[in-house]
A protein has these predicted regions:
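Transmembrane alpha-helical core residues of multi-pass small-molecule transporters
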Residues: 67, 102, 106, 180-181, ...
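Hydrophobic alpha-helical transmembrane segments that constitute the membrane-spanning cores
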Residues: 102, 114-115, 184, 189
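Transmembrane alpha-helix boundary and packing residues in multipass membrane permease domains
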Residues: 83-84, 111, 120, 162, ...
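Transmembrane helix-bundle signature of multi-pass membrane transporters/permeases
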Residues: 100-104, 151, 175-183
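Membrane-interfacial helix-loop-helix
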Residues: 2-10, 20-64, 93, 104-159, ...
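Hydrophobic core positions of alpha-helical segments in small-molecule transporters
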Residues: 63, 98, 176-177, 189, ...
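Extracellular/periplasmic helix-loop-helix junctions in multi-pass membrane proteins
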Residues: 186-204
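Transmembrane helix boundary and interhelical junction motifs in multipass membrane proteins
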Residues: 65-94, 154-160, 172, 179-188
């Protein structure tokens, strides 16, 4: 019964992927819109994202929700730009609720894509090296990996979601850890995003980049030292 369910899930997801690719290449309007969305995230300017979302008027919140799910699937597009935009557009706590719920939906989609379609698809949507790094975290911290990674801003939330789907972890354990883990970052980004204007925007963005790079260097050094330690123990 379980195998039949997984097979059905694979068929449904494959049909959805094929349909999405076909629409992208065959419908000019969709192609143009998707290219615009990619360029918007690539700009690194949350005001561009905010203006795009705001242009949909009464449907702005719905568009933001869908964009968050899209950026989750198309890792590693920067989610913090959308979180900043939501806070700046809707108010910091309203934006936080929207960003948190939509990020949870996106994480769930990534989890099930990996769980149903497997590692090859997950690697194509993220990166082989990125998943390998998260695998290292899972080997070391087990189920606590989700909570730890969600609290580290320099680790892609989306890659963690895909990696979790490749493990034996239950969806509910993943969902709860994800919800708790990404709440602090969502609140902080939303609060800051609600105040960002002009020079403050550039200043905070620079601080975030500096912090992320510093933390990344520290973590890579830690992983390198652990591997060297294992090699030395293996020689003894």
């Amino acid at each position: 019964m379980k195998e039949k369910k997984n097979w059905l899930g694979k068929v449904v997801l494959l049909i959805a992927v094929i349909a999405a690719v076909a629409v992208y290449f065959l419908v000019p309007g969709v192609n143009k819109m998707m290219n615009k969305v990619f360029a918007m995230f690539a700009s690194g300017d949350f005001t561009v994202v905010r203006d795009f979302v705001a242009s949909y008027g009464a449907y702005a919140a719905v568009i933001s929700f869908l964009l968050m799910i899209f950026q989750s699937i198309a890792a590693p597009l920067p989610a913090f730009l959308l979180t900043f935009a939501n806070a700046n557009l809707f108010g910091w706590w309203q934006g936080a609720i929207l960003s948190w719920t939509s990020a949870m939906a996106g994480a769930s989609v990534c989890f099930y894509i990996a769980r149903i379609l497997g590692r090859d698809v997950a690697e194509k949507l993220t990166s082989k090296s990125g998943l390998a790094q998260i695998d290292t975290f899972f080997e070391r911290y087990g189920k606590n990996t989700i909570l730890i990674c969600r609290l580290l801003p320099f680790i892609s939330f989306d890659i963690v979601s895909y990696a979790a789907g490749l493990t034996s972890m239950s969806f509910m354990s993943f969902f709860i850890a994800t919800g708790i883990g990404q709440l602090p970052a969502t609140i902080v980004y939303s609060y800051v995003g609600g105040m960002l204007t002009g020079g403050a925007k550039l200043f905070v963005t620079a601080l975030i980049i500096l912090f992320a790079l510093s933390a990344l260097i520290f973590m890579l050094r830690k992983i390198y030292m652990d591997r060297q330690s294992k090699k030395e123990k293996g020689r003894i």
